[in-house]
Design a protein with these regions (language model features):
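Positively charged, solvent-exposed patches that mediate nucleic-acid binding
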Residues: 1-109
Length: 109
């Protein structure tokens, strides 16, 4: 099961030592830990979306996409940053996110 990151040290490790992949408006930073938990974080910058309603909607959409991921490798924690001033349709977000997961986060190498 994938849960939100609660540990501040893990977030710091992800941002300092993690690998980065980009595609379109998405940036995913991830790091492999030696535990069996998969954890995630989501960031939608306030400078792009002033309205909290829109930021929360985008975060809910990402949570829905992440919770439906079933093939994720154990021990991978990641942080998704949505870095675009335009809103994107859910289907496009889902496609971008899944392609990035297949590209790097899901791979077993």
């Amino acid at each position: 099961m994938i849960t939100p990151i609660k540990n501040k040290k893990k977030i710091e490790i992800i941002f300092d030592n993690g690998k980065v992949i980009r595609k379109g408006p998405l940036l995913i930073k991830f790091h492999e830990f030696n535990d069996d938990e998969n954890e995630y974080g989501i960031s939608v910058p306030k400078r792009h979306f002033k309205s909290a309603v829109i930021r929360n909607k985008i975060k809910r959409q990402f949570r829905e996409i992440i919770n439906k991921q079933t093939l994720m490798r154990r021990g991978v924690s990641f942080f998704i940053i949505y870095n675009s001033p335009e809103k994107t349709l859910f289907a496009k977000l889902k496609g971008l996110t899944e392609s990035l997961f297949k590209k790097r986060v899901d791979t077993t190498s």
